[in-house]
Design a protein with these regions (language model features):
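Membrane-embedded beta-strand positions of outer-membrane beta-barrel proteins
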Residues: 41-43, 76-78, 155, 185-189, ...
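Outer-membrane beta-barrel channels and translocator barrels
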Residues: 69-71, 148-150, 179-181, 234-236, ...
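Short sequence motifs at beta-strands and strand-loop junctions characteristic
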Residues: 35, 52-56, 127-135, 147, ...
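Outer-membrane beta-barrel "beta-signal"
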Residues: 377, 416-430
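Extracellular loop and loop/strand-boundary signature of outer-membrane beta-barrel proteins
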Residues: 47-50, 125-129, 156-160, 171-175, ...
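Outer-membrane beta-barrel translocator/channel fold
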Residues: 77-139, 185-237, 249, 333-378, ...
């Protein structure tokens, strides 16, 4: 369930609703929106693969959008992705072979009638479950319309299901234009409900890995709000400022993550299931800009995020769309991300220390920097059609990768991630 990388933000539905409103008001202040438009269909096939034979994802996407006139718009998206490959389980490399069981197993000791699938990691290698495979189906449906003069309402829902995780969410947002439609204020909310039913059962947090103590299905709730302002700065410049706040409560632990327990020398002495707090508050401030630069359009944004787990982050994202011919464009893309580690993040747990109440070795909670560099090429074909190809490289570099303990010296405890993204897209109106 939570082994997939990267996970979408929990407030994605809220962001989509609010941004859609912002874009349909200030960004369209000088357009006529009372005329019905054709159906717009966008399809894409995304392929993501991590180096060294880790996770790979194949994801077809279909989006349908229809403007019925008078700014009454329906927008629906369907995603079906398949993930497979090897996924790190949270333990660190060791000088000796290590044996683990896949999550659906019931024991580390094979015996008659037992549902057990074991895998052994050779010395010096990062423990990864080679049996990881998951399919996810997700859909979003949103509707937006005017409410009174210079105001808009948007609302929608989201459903997602996979073998061990189900999610349902609703969102709504309102916006109002003023200052001759050069300024738009927006506010919205999002409510999400998730069910977690891990393969083999949800482990009791912080318990001994070898005991296989499991409990029933778990749930979590996420509630969020967003407020924003969009301003037409000039004929060529549109700026947007958003503040978001969301609170998660319930089962926030990853049921498939463990931690290594080591002695004073760094030798492996066992494993513990991870344990996370049962609540999390996250806040972010976003500043976005779209600037027309002759035959090019610059999209530059900065986001500052923080939460009560101690994870503080900075994101700079830039796209530059360049018209290289009448019917062709190039769009270079650079994204830089940095975050601090969660307060309870540990590469491993020392046997001599008191067992922490909260602990996780999930690399997504570690301190790291991530960089995405790529380019998108698009060409108009046929009548109102467009074909596009996107190529990107992603690299994640952890800050903490080594240990001074004797048995762990020279081992790469958190090697990071390198991945390639290829996406082919098609857009057509009819």
């Amino acid at each position: 369930m939570q082994l997939k990388r990267p996970n979408p933000p929990l407030q994605l539905g809220l962001m989509a609703a609010s941004c859609a409103l912002l874009g349909s008001t200030a960004a369209q202040a000088q357009t006529v929106a009372d005329k019905a438009l054709p159906w717009q269909v966008e399809t894409a096939l995304l392929y993501y693969k991590e180096n060294a034979g880790l996770l790979q994802t194949i994801e077809p996407i279909v989006n349908l959008k229809k403007d019925f006139g008078d700014q009454r718009v329906v927008d629906g998206t369907f995603i079906l992705d398949t993930m497979s490959g090897a996924s790190p389980n949270g333990a660190i490399p060791s000088r000796k072979p290590q044996t683990f069981a896949s999550p659906s197993s019931t024991s580390l000791t094979p015996r008659a009638g037992a549902k057990t699938k074991l895998y052994t990691i050779t010395p010096g290698n990062l423990p990864e479950d080679p049996h990881f495979k998951e399919q996810r189906a997700a859909g979003d449906l949103d509707w937006s319309q005017p409410i009174g003069i210079d105001s808009n309402l948007s609302y929608g829902g989201h459903l997602s299901t996979e073998h061990d995780f189900n999610s349902a969410a609703v969102n709504a947002a309102v916006s109002h234009d003023f200052n001759n439609k050069n300024t738009t204020l927006s506010a919205g909310f999002n409510e999400e409900y998730d069910q977690i039913h891990a393969r083999g059962g949800n482990p009791v947090p912080a318990t001994d890995y070898t005991l296989y103590e499991k409990e029933g299905n778990q749930t979590k709730n996420v509630a969020g709000v967003l407020v924003g302002v969009t301003q037409v700065m000039s004929r060529n410049w549109l700026a947007q400022l958003n503040y978001s706040y969301d609170r998660s409560q319930g089962y926030l632990t990853d049921p498939y993550r463990i931690l290594s327990v080591v002695d004073a020398s760094g030798a492996e002495m066992g494993y513990r299931y991870e344990s996370r707090p049962d609540s999390r508050v996250r806040q972010s401030l976003y500043l976005g800009n779209k600037v027309a630069l002759g035959p090019a359009v610059l999209d530059l944004s900065y986001r500052r995020g923080k939460d009560d787990w101690g994870v503080n982050s900075d994101t700079v994202d830039t796209h530059l769309r360049i018209d290289v011919a009448r019917d062709m464009y190039l769009e270079p893309h650079v994204r830089w991300y940095r975050q601090s580690a969660a307060d309870f993040y540990h590469l491993y747990v020392n046997q001599a220390d008191p067992l922490p109440t909260d602990m996780s070795a999930d690399p997504r909670l570690a301190a790291f920097t991530g960089t995405t560099i790529g380019v998108k090429f698009g060409v108009k074909v046929a009548h109102s059609g467009e074909l596009s190809l996107r190529l990107e490289e992603y690299q994640q570099k952890p800050t903490d990768r080594s240990s001074p303990l004797t048995e762990l010296q020279g081992l790469d405890l958190n090697p990071g991630i390198k991945g390639t993204i290829v996406q082919i897209g098609w857009r057509q109106e009819f």
